[in-house]
């Protein structure tokens, strides 16, 4: 908050409205602060009447001058990524500056000189949006070239434009004037901005401030007379099988919210700005899959981990498997693709005709190892008698193992150094990945599982429970008689329980 005594205060307001407000920082300036922006990845940006742009650092409680233009600062706006900002000055100049690393960063410095002071300004995904008293809304490219213009000079009912804000997706713009809000949306197909029907509100008077909620669902408008109006910004709503509400707040952004009380939703957004066409909730209502014309989005709803990968339209014949907590397995036309949740790239792709969770094993950093930062391994079937092994970090084949009988189950241990597999004759085999040495360890095997968090193996052979406490010595086996069939091995709070179903 910038005050008229040239002091900027930072308040800690808490999570709830009723919490006590506490001043945590104070920055004294030599000139009046005319505008403020706070990029999510950097310090607070202050625009001053003397033309200086200053950065206020909350951790050190110190401010520094980033640059000086000798022209009154009339607007400061941050980009949606929170890595940079634009400053508008009374002489019409617009300056771009970055406060954090940005892979898509453009050249810093003066971008363009607008015809009037840019009192209303926003930084969209592809353009710089400017408006003011001349009743024009102008869109500049990132290089400062005029791309588009909407001129309302001949509209007698229109007054000067006072403020604007951009949607979190960067694809919708709201511009405020007298008793009116004008809306513009970016058309990905047409590659231009389209004007939507204006919203008129009698006795709202001049709109002096606009803010778009981070999830894109609402716009707050402040007026000259002290009123604050809250508007919904929704393209459409739908309900998925009575369990989830899908709110399309923009072409490339959807709010996915469980209808169950107390549940938190996720913001599904295309990082490339593509229009989201289809959203599905899958995997026991724990995962989502969405499509755009050029990409596919997958996500873990419980951990709010979202991924977007390039994906051409293949007719919608994909099959999805969510048995692994770390990766989504996508099977299409004989090809298996692995997508790690939270990563915007395909982890790996292999050819296989056997798409069964029991015939594929993926380990993604399941257990930390000393001296190993990334450990990602894949085991799958080339044919019913051949197991292939892949290192997904470096993208090369670790080797293959051929068996004399058809394989019906396989699983890597958590470190990816050992592989257990069982054949149709119920023979259990162990393979060391480093040496590619295969050892037969058990006959008549009806159940087998690695104990979570360890290299201990539990299996069943006829009426015996077999345990390997040291898998490095497979000949050392502990056998206990049981009555029934083992159905699961559970490890909780440092204890391991074997679940047996009585016959």
Predicted regions located by residue number:
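Short loop/turn segments that connect beta-strands within beta-propeller blades
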Residues: 13-16, 58-61, 99-102, 142-145, ...
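Blade-level signature of beta-propeller repeat domains, shared across WD40, Kelch, NHL, RCC1
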Residues: 208-238
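Short coil/turn segments that connect the beta-strands within blades of beta-propeller domains
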Residues: 41-43, 81-83, 125-126, 169-171, ...
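Short C-terminal beta-strands that terminate individual repeats in beta-propeller domains
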Residues: 21-28, 63-69, 106-113, 149-155, ...
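Conserved beta-strand element within WD40/beta-propeller blades
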Residues: 1-3, 44-48, 85-89, 128-132, ...
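Canonical WD40 repeat/beta-propeller blade segments in eukaryotic WD-repeat proteins
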Residues: 30-38, 71-78, 114-123, 157-166, ...
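Short coil/turn segments within WD40 beta-propeller repeats
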Residues: 5-9, 50-54, 91-95, 134-137, ...
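Conserved blade-register residue in beta-propeller folds
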Residues: 10, 55, 96, 139, ...
